[in-house]
Amino acid sequence: MSVLALGLSHRSAPVTLLERVALSGEVRLKLMTEMVNTSAVNEAMVVSTCNRTEVYADVDQFHPGVAAICELLSQYTGVSQEELTQHCYVHYEERAVQHLFSVACGLDSMVVGEGQILGQVRNALKDAQHVGTLGRVLNDLGQRALRVGKRAHTETHLDKAGASMVSFGLTVAGRFLTPDREPQPSAAAAVCPVDGDTGVEVSAALPDPQLLTGRRIMVLGAGSMSALAANTVARHGASTILIANRTFDRAQRLAECLTEGYESVRSSAVPFEDAARHLADIDLVISCTGAQGIVLTAEQVAAGGDRATRPLVFLDLALPHDIDKAVRKLPGVHLVDIEELRDAAEDGTATGQVADLTAVRDIVAEEVAEYQAVRSAERVAPTVVALRSKAQKVVESELERLNGRLPGIDDRTRAEITRTVRRVVDKLLHQPTVRVKQLATGPEGAVYAEALRELFDLDPAIPSAVVKPGTALGEER
């Protein structure tokens, strides 16, 4: 059982390729299921966000595992294996563990330190559990990753310094908003609500608290990122928020939550197909629908009227893109998308406030070492169990032989002989079994377990049970 991580992210691939490998929820579930149906993959989990598509797997062998995952990823995305291998990265064992922990902390994010990725990792765990591809190895690894992410945000200043993709995007998009607009009555800044599962705020902080004061905002989509965006703009003083989603009742629920949480915000839901009709009254559109194609065309935006005197800004956080790039040709219309955000992040805009990265990296290193020590001890445990089981069988066999050869021994003597033989065997096994557990935590720990198996002709069964659908994460299986 070995952990393998294979993926593409904003660090390794162009945005155009990330768009093509982005996986919708249903496709992601099917991909994980098909992966564990191969002989090379025991468990599988997929983390898919606007900036990364990554597969985490428990495999028996490195090369067959990589080959199986690449082949299926190519089939499900339509991207050739040759193109995938040019841009993907592969991490194995300790490096794979370190990578996931760094991802969960936000160290590998486009906006270093952003907290949204922690919730996305948790959702990936839930998805894998739902379809039955989450086993003990990935469940333990994922739970540890969530713990590392929480530590990074609570024990350092990363939570204050690290912006989410939403807050970073709003900061960049805000540069195009009219600076001398007439402010409207708006909500006072509210205390950031916190996600009970991750401990991370469900709205993000902006460097300029007045950036959105009095703005009229439309949010396309009602998923987790859309909810984060809606809460963020409400918290920072937006006067009006329209929510448009293909499932209208989800848009209504989000609008109701905003109304309850921010009394001065006028929030309402509009049918998704009517979204373009409301553009004339909107300053900023935030889109992250998860659709597989354009949801607003340049023609629809142009029909909303001339914006030469009052700009209309689009913040497109979706992959694939939601907003037609041709809107950039329209007077007064500005589009900020993932590609532009990546360029801004590479300029240093995103990481300028992160002051405690060293402390976070230390946390990651500490947790990786602890996780590896536990894994090493777990790996040798079946060998120790098999050794003790074999010794027990030898004891029972010899005692049975003794009873057959000396049937006249009284019960008291027989019991004393039995205790003595078992004590001798236990004492003989105690030191080597304790020592092999200690040695197992070292870099060559597996060698000692293998030596025991060879010397005593052991064949321990190493279980790799899969979490059953419906079992709560972290529960005994």
From Swiss-Prot:
Pathway entry: Porphyrin-containing compound metabolism; protoporphyrin-IX biosynthesis; 5-aminolevulinate from L-glutamyl-tRNA(Glu): step 1/2
Stored Gene3D superfamilies: Glutamyl-tRNA reductase, N-terminal domain, NAD(P)-binding Rossmann-like Domain
Top-level lineage group: Bacteria
Binding site for substrate: T49, C50, N51, R52, S109, E114, G115, Q116, Q120
Catalytic residues identified in the record: C50
EC number: 1.2.1.70
Residues that hold NADP(+) according to the record: G221, A222, G223, S224, M225, S226
Keyword Transcription regulation: no
Entries under CDD domains matching the protein: NAD_bind_Glutamyl_tRNA_reduct
Enzyme class name: oxidoreductase
Pfam families in the record: GlutR_dimer, GlutR_N, Shikimate_DH
UniProt-listed GO biological process terms: protoporphyrinogen IX biosynthetic process from glutamate
InterPro entries cross-referenced by the UniProt entry: 4pyrrol_synth_GluRdtase, 4pyrrol_synth_GluRdtase_dimer, 4pyrrol_synth_GluRdtase_N, GluRdtase_CS, GluRdtase_dimer_dom_sf, GluRdtase_N_sf, NAD(P)-bd_dom_sf, Shikm_DH/Glu-tRNA_Rdtase
Catalytic activity of the protein: (S)-4-amino-5-oxopentanoate + tRNA(Glu) + NADP(+) = L-glutamyl-tRNA(Glu) + NADPH + H(+)
Keywords of the record: NADP, Oxidoreductase, Porphyrin biosynthesis
Molecular function GO terms recorded: glutamyl-tRNA reductase activity; NADP binding
Site (Important for activity): H99
Notes on the domains: Possesses an unusual extended V-shaped dimeric structure with each monomer consisting of three distinct domains arranged along a curved 'spinal' alpha-helix. The N-terminal catalytic domain specifically recognizes the glutamate moiety of the substrate. The second domain is the NADPH-binding domain, and the third C-terminal domain is responsible for dimerization.
Functional summary from the UniProt entry: Catalyzes the NADPH-dependent reduction of glutamyl-tRNA(Glu) to glutamate 1-semialdehyde (GSA).
Miscellaneous comment in the UniProt entry for this protein: During catalysis, the active site Cys acts as a nucleophile attacking the alpha-carbonyl group of tRNA-bound glutamate with the formation of a thioester intermediate between enzyme and glutamate, and the concomitant release of tRNA(Glu). The thioester intermediate is finally reduced by direct hydride transfer from NADPH, to form the product GSA.
Family, per entry: Belongs to the glutamyl-tRNA reductase family.
Subunit structure and binding partners: Homodimer.
PANTHER family linked: GLUTAMYL-TRNA REDUCTASE
Protein name: Glutamyl-tRNA reductase
Species annotation: Thermobifida fusca (strain YX)
